[in-house]
């Protein structure tokens, strides 16, 4: 019985957030069916004294949650984007529009995933199983589109891993700013 349960957990995790290779037919779109159910938006102000408001977005898939200390627990996929740059006057929330992944701080851009001083930063995916990070995948190019409908935010991500594997996902729900 334990073996069957383990297979189900592994299958569910893979189904929740496994990227797919880019399709060979350029007229079709391959999508990933990551289902993100929780979001946390963080405001850092003009963190780098660069004239930009800096934000981060943390999305959790089904099966993940935060414990009382703020650590991620459970099994699933965590999409994290740090260093999202918005115009200086965007002090309440990220403005609607399309943001492009880049390696420099510019309005309506966010930093690509990278290792910096022994830590991962920028845009990346964490595959988590039983509250332990199993895999880190850096995102190296792509876009994020933000829209707002009443109290909900709509996030549409068209991102790529370092090996050019496409990762597409969406989030629709409340935008909790901290």
Where are these regions (language model features)?
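Edge beta-strand at a domain terminus
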Residues: 23-26, 83, 140-144, 156-178
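Positively charged n-region of N-terminal signal peptides that target proteins for export
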Residues: 1-4
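Surface-exposed helix/loop patches within compact recognition domains
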Residues: 48-145
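Short, hydrophobic/aromatic-rich segments at coil-to-beta transitions
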Residues: 54-55, 150-156
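Post-signal peptide N-terminal segment of mature Sec-exported envelope proteins
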Residues: 25-43
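Sec-dependent N-terminal signal peptides
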Residues: 7-8
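C-terminal motif of bacterial Sec signal peptides marking the signal peptidase cleavage site
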Residues: 13-16
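Bacterial signal peptide processing site
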Residues: 18-21
């Amino acid at each position: 019985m334990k073996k069957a349960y383990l297979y189900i957990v592994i299958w569910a995790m893979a189904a929740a957030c496994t990227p797919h290779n880019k399709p060979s037919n350029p007229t079709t779109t391959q999508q990933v069916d990551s289902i993100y159910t929780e979001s946390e938006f963080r405001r850092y102000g003009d963190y780098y004294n660069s004239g930009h408001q800096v934000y981060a977005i943390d999305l959790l898939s089904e099966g993940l949650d935060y414990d009382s200390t703020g650590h991620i627990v459970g099994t699933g996929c965590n999409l994290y984007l740090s260093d999202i740059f918005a115009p200086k006057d965007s002090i309440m929330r990220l403005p609607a529009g399309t943001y492009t992944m880049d390696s420099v701080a510019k309005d309506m851009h966010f930093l690509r995933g990278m290792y910096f001083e022994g830590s991962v930063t920028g845009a990346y995916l964490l595959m988590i199983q039983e509250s332990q990070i199993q895999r880190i995948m850096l995102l190296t190019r792509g876009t994020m589109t933000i829209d707002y409908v009443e109290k909900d935010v709509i996030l549409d991500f068209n991102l790529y891993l370092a090996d050019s594997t496409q990762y597409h996902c969406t989030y629709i729900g409340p935008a909790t700013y901290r």
